[in-house]
């Protein structure tokens, strides 16, 4: 697989000529790669692309895959940011979610990363879990703050179709948390982290001392990016592309004539819709310049803007239209109110 990834990196080097601000190893368990494999991939990235000296180089890792020796090796390779999937501090929930770690490993792995010299660590948490009490959620957040991590990503549990969770809920084996309790946990999340110095810069993301994720911010600001490997997505302004998901087909793509990726040209309506879908999620909002570039508001859309401002869900920052704290609760639905028919 590593050889195939390197081949794709080389094949596509002319697609992204601008300086690279972020390199991200994600989409599974990249921390299972050994030092030599990671080093080989990083060498190919730096060989083929113009990576900025202060680029953010992130590795996703699960607690059970982190040791101090591994962390030191990652640091030595130039990886300068870790994104760790803690998810929960409750062993029963971790087991139920089929995670491979426990509560003790959560604390131990973060400690090891700091001992190895990392100073930019992000952790993922999930709220809205069945049976999660307000006091437990508060306890989770207190632990995270006490760790001193620079970044927190917190997501509400989603119930996907054709999953064990969906089946157990439908058969009354598990009672989902009510929407009102989910909102309460989200409200506590942002107020508690704000009290402890974290900036709520995107619906699900909080940063200490402006340690925003360059990688995620590139998505929200619709910057061009290339995704390498099975199922990876790429974006180039007016075009989206995604690789096939089958590992075998992906790795044998050089010997077969069949397409190993799909792509679509984005219509002006699609670009407009994405501008609001992504922009309304962040504290920077939807840029007035970007709106102007795409032809500006219709009369009906201007009325919608005024209505949202009057209601207190939106404000005009001068440079952009930004959702208020109350508006952020409904970011997706409010962005959809500006969608145009494709």
What are these regions, as identified by a protein language model?
Residues 295-309:
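Short amphipathic alpha-helical interaction segments
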Residues 328-342:
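Short, amphipathic alpha-helical interaction segments positioned at domain boundaries
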Residues 288-289, 301, 316:
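Extended hydrophobic-aromatic, low-complexity segments
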Residues 309-319:
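A short, conserved structural fragment
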Residues 1-14, 19-296:
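C-terminal scaffold of the Radical SAM
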Residues 320-324:
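Minor-groove-contacting beta-hairpin "wing" of winged helix-turn-helix DNA-binding domains
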Residues 183, 325-328:
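An alpha-helix initiation/capping motif
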